[in-house]
Curated annotation (Swiss-Prot):
Residue ranges that the UniProt entry lists as topological domain Cytoplasmic: 253-261
Designated name of the protein: Class II histocompatibility antigen, M alpha chain
Entry membrane topology: Single-pass type I membrane protein
Residue positions with a glycan: 41
Domain Ig-like C1-type: residue ranges: 114-215
Signal peptide (UniProt feature, chain positions): 1-26
Source organism: Mus musculus
Gene for this chain: H2-DMa
Alpha-2 as annotated region, ranges: 125-217
Amino acid sequence: MEHEQKSGAVLLRLLRLLWLLPHSWAVLEASTPVLWDDPQNHTFRHTLFCQDGIPNIGLSETYDEDELFSFDFSQNTRVPRLPDFAEWAQGQGDASAIAFGKSFCEMLMREVSPKLEGQIPVSRGLSVAEVFTLKPLEFGKPNTLVCFISNLFPPTLTVNWQLHSAPVEGASPTSISAVDGLTFQAFSYLNFTPEPFDLYSCTVTHEIDRYTAIAYWVPQNALPSDLLENALCGVAFALGVLGTIIGIVFFLCSQRPCSGD
């Protein structure tokens, strides 16, 4: 009897929160900034998630699958992905709505998830990793490696970088954002200076089932260095001068009278 009363109290609290949830969404929609005046159809996605993993709470805001903001719950502030978005990150006035969403999500996970465990199938995504450079590759010039992780669900993972199988430190915190289809994607960035024989790897480990995806990067199609460009220009100039001299010689020879009888 006591157990039934406790379950009823939990469900009653859940119904009350479900009734309040649309009101919190209305506050959020009213404070959503208009970034571009474009008559085409676009999608602004505000996704808050919580889970038994790292990170245990997260919020991402995307525009047509491109992340604009994440949320730092320890500082209670938005974090722009690019400096150009900083002015929109401040003063949105929806901190109370975000706090409500966080509490609601944590309550669902705490009160409802244990009752559904073993009764509904568990979804898993096999992560796919890809590594590429942020700027065109030039040996000896600073650049950034990007590890892009797709098909991520649930969004709990660790990312490790290696150079010639040795761990590399200094990577940026992993950025997670929601995409269409109730899945997530993530980005990890590593600043580096490329050399001709580099071999970098990005290892992505899914915390739930310990599934690991590895992506490798080796230099390909590098732009010519300044020294090589100067050498090629010098060779081209020398060939041009040599061709001019040969042309003049042939012209002079053609003007000489033929020796006859």
